[in-house]
Design a protein with these regions (language model features):
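N-terminal capping/lid subdomain adjacent to the active-site entrance of alpha/beta enzymes
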Residues: 1-172, 177-179, 190-195
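Catalytic core of soluble alpha/beta enzymes
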Residues: 145, 150-249
Length: 249
């Protein structure tokens, strides 16, 4: 069966820039994919890598694909292409074949409630107040906060104010994007390890400090993120939490 592949670039500005320890993200860009078979069935996919090096690899992979190709060739590409390209093509093929989407007998599964991402720094408190007003309270909500974006003393003060405002049923995830050193990460873990609202510290140390990550995980909950991208073998061996993004793997 021959499949026709169309690609369209997209780029849009985020409503609010995302500050992380690695810098500031102001826009998202990628490709919208459309697959069509000989019977007119259509499937859609998206390729939206986060890292610049991923974007270049995806650009090259998509540029190498012909506009028409046999399904067997496409399936071979899925196994060899960069993760975001494999996901986008796989999603389009799955919808075209009726595995997911309107043609599927099961339809789409309901998405779980996401964690609410709070802005980094002092803007976090006003965003928390706005969330409480819009949701009628903060009970049973999960919040994610980017840390290691400002001086540690300021962030520790903001943490205490945040903890004062969160009810006992709320959950908290702190994402350092590898921006802490060992002493800073340990200080945060010691402060939070006995707080039942803590889900985890996400990528508290740099990818290169795997020993430090393992030592910190012995003190409290640690989730790996960037480490899994650069060392995929950890997806099988890491016994703690893992932040997984199928769209990028």
């Amino acid at each position: 069966m021959t499949l026709r592949l169309q690609r369209r670039r997209f780029r849009f500005a985020l409503l609010q820039p995302l500050r992380t320890a690695a810098g500031e993200l102001r826009e998202r860009c990628g490709w919208l994919l459309r697959l069509e078979n000989d019977q007119g069935a259509v499937g859609w996919g998206e390729v939206a890598p986060l890292q610049p090096q991923q974007f270049m690899a995806c650009d090259q992979a998509l540029a190498s694909l012909p506009d028409e190709l046999p399904q067997a060739q496409l399936e071979a590409v899925l196994r060899e292409a960069p993760g975001p390209v494999g996901f986008g093509l796989g999603a389009a093929l799955a919808e075209l074949q009726g595995v997911v989407g309107p043609a599927s007998p099961q339809g789409w599964l309901k998405a779980p409630a996401p964690a609410l991402l709070l802005p980094a720094g002092e803007a976090m408190l006003s965003a928390l107040e706005a969330a409480a007003a819009s949701m009628g309270g903060l009970e049973s909500c999960t919040f994610k906060l980017k840390v290691a974006t400002a001086p540690d003393g300021l962030e520790r003060q903001l943490l205490e104010q945040l903890l004062q405002r969160l009810p006992p049923s709320a959950r908290l995830r702190l994402d350092a994007n590898g921006g802490w050193d060992r002493s800073t990460a340990e200080a945060w873990m010691q402060r939070l390890r006995d707080d039942p609202r803590l889900d985890w510290l996400e990528q508290p140390l740099a990818v290169q400090d795997q020993i430090g990550l393992e030592q910190l995980a012995a003190l409290g909950p640690v989730a790996l993120d960037e480490s899994l991208d650069q060392h995929p073998e950890l997806r099988r061996s890491w016994s703690g939490w893992q932040v997984r993004r199928p769209a990028l793997e």
